């Protein structure tokens, strides 16, 4: 009999292949496994996007196949209060937030963990995220590690977790590559084996982002200008654009000074004038940053960084690691200097720090340190 047989794990069942295989693997490892399906968004009448019922049906089918009980919980009000309102406020302020990070912080590893703990008497929770964790002995703090599949690693979205949360969490697919996860699901006859991965922001689903956002925030059209002040076109609202963006400006055929035909990129948002500044060419100095200032810091160890640290950083998901130096300003703010200038550093997004495979934590980008040519 496995040592795990006395341990109860509540798996977040999303109706996707990763959580399905997570539940199967934990059962194979001898744990007492139960599922919990979260409803985080009250669907509108638009049946085209209404996937919650389908996801629940898939989660139930998988649990039935594995012989485990599926609990259901509605976290829609917590989601609205703690994730969605922040998301809207950030967009209103001209920043580009990442709601998936906040959803993990406030819902999946807080509200979910508390419910699993207090109501379901769980020893652990488990999620289908592609991350790993250490299992230290001698009372050391567990660390969060990148997932083995570099293409799927999701540690960027989980940097707000504390070592206590990591200690209570299991990530069964973190040691696997995605094709292997699908192969296991197929072998076990799980209905989710070929289900495509969900994309887009959790509560928006596959629908068009601009249409969704315009329901909650009135659009304010304005000019798109060059750095010299030439009007290049019109934007429908600053909130629909992010720094470094190329698509969707509708000024593609327009030549710049001297007949320059290079593509246009968003370089800045001028909130006071409601103007989008666009520049030509990905190597334009206005797109580059020497570093950033970050706040709202979360370190996995929960100890503030007080010394200069050499490490790497990601300023967006699926980005190559950038070698950098962290310089503490105080316990709440840090300055980060890149070894080489970086493009499209975006206020509101998260900067997440690593030493090797270990995720140290991260913070919200408050502002970028603009590139100054020598």
Swiss-Prot record:
Entry GO terms, CC: cytoplasm
Any GO BP: tRNA wobble position uridine thiolation
Predominant location: cytoplasm
Catalytic activity: S-sulfanyl-L-cysteinyl-[protein] + uridine(34) in tRNA + AH2 + ATP = 2-thiouridine(34) in tRNA + L-cysteinyl-[protein] + A + AMP + diphosphate + H(+)
Binding site for ATP: 12-19, 38, 128
Top-level enzyme category: transferase
CDD domains attached to this UniProt entry: MnmA_TRMU-like
Region ranges (Interaction with tRNA): 152-154, 316-317
Protein's recorded name: tRNA-specific 2-thiouridylase MnmA
């Amino acid at each position: 009999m496995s040592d795990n047989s006395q341990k109860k794990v509540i798996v977040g069942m999303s109706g996707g292949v990763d959580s399905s295989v997570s539940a199967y693997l934990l059962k194979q490892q001898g744990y007492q496994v139960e599922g919990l399906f979260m409803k985080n968004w009250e669907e509108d009448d638009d049946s085209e996007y209404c996937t919650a019922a389908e996801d629940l049906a898939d989660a139930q089918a998988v649990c039935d196949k594995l012989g485990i009980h599926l609990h259901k919980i509605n976290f829609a009000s917590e989601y609205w209060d703690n994730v969605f309102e922040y998301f809207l406020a950030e967009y209103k302020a001209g920043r580009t937030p990442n709601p998936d990070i906040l959803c993990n912080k406030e819902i999946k590893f807080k509200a979910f963990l508390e419910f699993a703990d207090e109501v379901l008497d769980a020893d652990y929770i488990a999620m289908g995220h592609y991350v790993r964790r250490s299992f230290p002995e001698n009372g050391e703090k567990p660390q969060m590690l990148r997932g083995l599949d570099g293409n799927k690693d999701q540690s960027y979205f989980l940097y707000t977790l504390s070592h206590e949360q990591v200690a209570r969490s299991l990530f069964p697919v973190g040691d696997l590559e995605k094709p292997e996860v699908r192969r296991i699901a197929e072998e076990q006859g799980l209905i989710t084996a070929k289900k495509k991965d969900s994309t887009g922001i959790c509560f928006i689903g596959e629908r068009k982002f601009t249409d969704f956002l315009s329901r909650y925030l009135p659009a304010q059209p304005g000019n798109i200008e060059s750095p010299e002040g030439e009007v290049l076109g019109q934007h429908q609202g600053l909130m629909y654009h992010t720094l470094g963006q190329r698509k969707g400006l509708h000024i593609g055929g327009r030549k710049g000074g001297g007949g320059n035909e290079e593509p246009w990129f968003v370089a800045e948002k001028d909130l006071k004038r409601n103007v989008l500044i666009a520049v030509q060419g990905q190597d334009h100095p206005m797109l580059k940053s020497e570093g950033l200032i970050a706040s709202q810091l979360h370190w996995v160890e929960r100890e503030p960084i007080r010394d200069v640290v050499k490490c790497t950083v990601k300023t967006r998901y699926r980005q190559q690691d950038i070698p950098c130096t962290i310089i503490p300003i105080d316990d709440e703010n840090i300055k980060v200097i890149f070894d080489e200038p970086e493009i499209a550093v975006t206020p509101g997004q998260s900067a997440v720090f690593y030493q090797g495979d270990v995720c140290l934590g991260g913070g919200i980008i408050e502002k970028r340190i603009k590139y100054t040519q020598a």
